[in-house]
């Protein structure tokens, strides 16, 4: 999965004082507002309409709900439940409390405010605790968004993907140790570069042991770069949208958050990162780790930019990372991310079949529950291989017939054999938005119709639409008729124009909220449900300026290379304000023996490595450690200069002037209103 952003989010006015460097991890930032968000959650949530009940009932007839195989698999190997006590931080802050989802009870029928297929998926996800996958392989499930896997070797244990937070990872390891021998951790494997697969590493190993060679950390090529950089440039936007995607502002109940389809939600603890010691660079690499033979398959650009699958030969066990789970995954994440390639994804699954399909006996992933049996594993890999390929090929076939993105998304239906398998349902991704993403991957956002080439911005467009439709009252009156017919998609689309034309029109916002809410109740995708219901909540209640604490991760900051850091600064430069200004600074990092020139000119900030400008306004000498301390607000530029940690020759005011031109971003920007 998916959110490891850095941002400069602030809460409050857009004109708040400049904060030099403030970073946050988007998973963590979104999760950190869970508890405070509950206090204003949707007491105005409405019941399901007859149209919604009918839509959800129809799905009960379409899918084989009498097939309980998934429940048998999810219970298989159960050893112990999660402890009843929630995980809290040192200050009493809530980090993880799966008991909030106790209302999702196995065996109970879906409430009419929930899609029955998503309800079923949430029931399965809530089957939690410590499980044996096969002899010597164990998983802790539902102690975070992802699973933590533990493999017993000759001298110790190897941990796969230590969750999001240090606290949840430690609790997962403690649970394992209560029921298994307390062998030392001798290796960690990061399957890919999303934070829910590495953020808790300091909860299971000590970095001193890594540096001493007692613990090895394996990761795919490009892991560190992508773990830090994937979402840096759009961190605040991604984080805000993540609060919608994971439903962090919603109450967990039958009219609110059910989970995310991939897991329940994200933990809100301490995100950490220890750089890998061993890099997997290509398919076919074999490593003996603690007496077991690991065969690796490099799969970049599948579910993550840096990802790998691997097979433990002695166990005949395939770790599918996040490329084959019990859901149609995202080829585009609704929080915002670069689009993933479904064709490449399909080919990786085909390669896994080629490499290990004859021998594999169990497949487990870093979300959900395992699949046992050679025939069953091959079937899941084959069907999901064909699912992603079908999305790719059918999107392009229809595009080449002249259909547009939206038209294709309405037309494409998966073959029945694929679509009726619960593991291929769109609980996290969705067929609709994955098709749209595939179109954009190949053809971009423009559909070819020149009428859509230079559209008006939403508010300007909305005012004209409302005027031409006879005014807001006329639109709302007609929209109510469509609402009563159950045409919620159209109501949401047309009333959105009224909301953007007249943002203070509460009647319009209430009708829009009602329509979005019913769409949420019908949604099979967890993120779709969360987006719809969070949008409805903010339309009714407004955007609540909740605290967004500084969740800076020292490990992430230290892992940023200077090139990325300077790009990040350049993104924050208020270009229009400095278009006619010119500043040149030389930077000398004495510990790294690296020199840079920064030049602010024409409204941009360029940096050049290995160069010192002859006529620079000033030369700044410092160490990377000092830069880290300033970034983490452990010191200030002024204090660092006073202590001699930063030396400035030339115009000492130019560095401060440059930093005064950096923008800060309000986390709580509007989404469903202008």
Curated annotation (Swiss-Prot):
Gene Ontology molecular function terms on file: linear primary-alkylsulfatase activity; metal ion binding; protein dimerization activity
Known catalytic reactions: a primary linear alkyl sulfate ester + H2O = a primary alcohol + sulfate + H(+)
Activity regulation statement: Inhibited by EDTA. Slightly activated in the presence of Ca(2+).
Protein origin, superkingdom: Bacteria
Kinase recorded as keyword: no
Localization: Periplasm
Practical applications according to UniProt: The thermal stability and higher specific activities make it an ideal candidate for the application in the biodegradation of SDS-containing waste water under elevated temperature conditions.
Biological processes, Gene Ontology terms: dodecyl sulfate metabolic process
List of residues binding Zn(2+) 1: 192, 194, 303, 322
Chief site of localization: periplasm
Protein name: Linear primary-alkylsulfatase
Organism phylogeny: Bacteria, Pseudomonadati, Pseudomonadota, Gammaproteobacteria, Pseudomonadales
């Amino acid at each position: 999965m998916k959110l490891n952003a850095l941002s400069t989010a602030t809460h409050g006015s857009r004109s708040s004082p400049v904060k030099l460097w403030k970073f946050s991890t988007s998973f963590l930032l979104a999760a950190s507002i869970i508890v405070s968000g509950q206090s204003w959650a949707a007491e105005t949530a409405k019941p399901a309409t007859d149209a919604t009940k009918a839509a959800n009932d129809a799905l009960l007839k379409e899918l084989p709900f009498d097939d309980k195989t998934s429940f048998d698999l999810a219970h298989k190997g159960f050893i112990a439940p999660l402890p009843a006590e929630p995980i809290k931080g040192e200050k009493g802050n809530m980090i993880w409390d799966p008991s909030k989802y106790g209302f999702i009870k196995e065996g109970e029928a879906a409430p009419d405010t929930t899609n029955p297929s998503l309800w079923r998926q949430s029931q399965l996800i809530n089957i939690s605790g410590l499980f044996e996958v096969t002899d010597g392989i164990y998983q802790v499930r539902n102690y975070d968004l992802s699973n933590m896997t533990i493999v017993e070797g000759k001298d110790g244990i190897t941990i796969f993907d230590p969750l999001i937070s240090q606290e949840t990872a430690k609790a997962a390891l403690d649970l394992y140790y209560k029921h298994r021998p307390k062998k030392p951790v001798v290796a960690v494997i990061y399957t890919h570069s999303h934070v829910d697969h590495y953020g808790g590493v300091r909860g299971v190993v000590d970095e001193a042991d890594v540096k001493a060679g007692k613990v090895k950390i394996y990761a795919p090529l490009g892991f560190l770069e992508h773990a830090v950089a994937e979402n840096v440039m759009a961190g605040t936007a991604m984080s805000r949208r993540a609060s919608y995607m994971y439903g962090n502002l919603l109450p967990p109940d039958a009219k609110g958050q059910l989970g995310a389809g991939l897991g329940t939600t994200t933990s809100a603890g301490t995100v950490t990162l220890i750089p890998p010691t061993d890099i997997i660079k290509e398919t076919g690499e074999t490593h003996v780790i603690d007496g077991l033979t690991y065969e690796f398959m490099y799969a970049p650009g599948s579910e993550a930019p840096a990802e790998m699958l691997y097979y433990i030969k002695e166990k005949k066990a395939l770790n599918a990372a996040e490329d084959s789970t019990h859901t149609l995954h995202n080829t585009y994440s609704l929080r915002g991310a670069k689009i993933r390639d479904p064709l490449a994804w399909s080919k990786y699954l085909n390669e896994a079949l080629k490499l290990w399909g004859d021998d594999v006996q169990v497949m487990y992933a870093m979300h959900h529950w395992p699949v046992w049996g050679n025939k069953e594993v091959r079937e899941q890999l084959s069907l999901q291989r064909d699912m992603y390929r079908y999305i790719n090929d059918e999107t392009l076939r229809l595009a080449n017939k002249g259909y547009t993105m939206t038209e294709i998304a309405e037309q494409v239906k998966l073959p029945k054999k694929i679509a009726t398998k619960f593991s291929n349902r769109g609980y996290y991704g969705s067929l609709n938005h994955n098709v749209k993403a595939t179109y954009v991957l190949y053809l971009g956002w423009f559909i070819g119709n020149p009428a859509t080439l230079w559209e008006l911005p939403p508010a300007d467009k909305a005012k004209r639409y409302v005027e031409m439709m006879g005014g807001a009252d006329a639109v709302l009156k007609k929209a109510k008729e469509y609402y009563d017919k159950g045409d919620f998609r159209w109501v949401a689309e047309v009333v959105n124009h009224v909301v953007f034309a007249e943002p203070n029109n509460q009647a319009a916002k209430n009708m829009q909220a009602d329509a979005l809410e019913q769409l949420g109740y019908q949604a099979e995708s967890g993120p779709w449900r969360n987006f719809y219901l969070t949008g409805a909540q903010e339309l009714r209640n407004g955007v609540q300026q909740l605290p967004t604490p500084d969740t800076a991760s020292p490990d992430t900051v230290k892992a940023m290379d200077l090139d990325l850091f300077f790009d990040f600064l350049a993104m924050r430069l208020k270009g229009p304000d400095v278009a006619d200004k010119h500043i040149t600074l030389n930077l000398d990092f004495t510990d790294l023996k690296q020199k840079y020139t920064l030049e602010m000119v024409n409204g941009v900030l360029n940096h050049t490595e290995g160069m010192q400008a002859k006529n620079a306004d000033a030369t700044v000498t410092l160490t990377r450690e000092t830069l880290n301390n300033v970034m983490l607000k452990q010191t200030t530029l002024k204090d660092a200069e006073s202590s001699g940690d930063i030396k400035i020759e030339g115009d000492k005011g130019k560095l401060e002037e440059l930093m005064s031109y950096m923008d800060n971003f309000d986390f709580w920007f509007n989404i469903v209103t202008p």
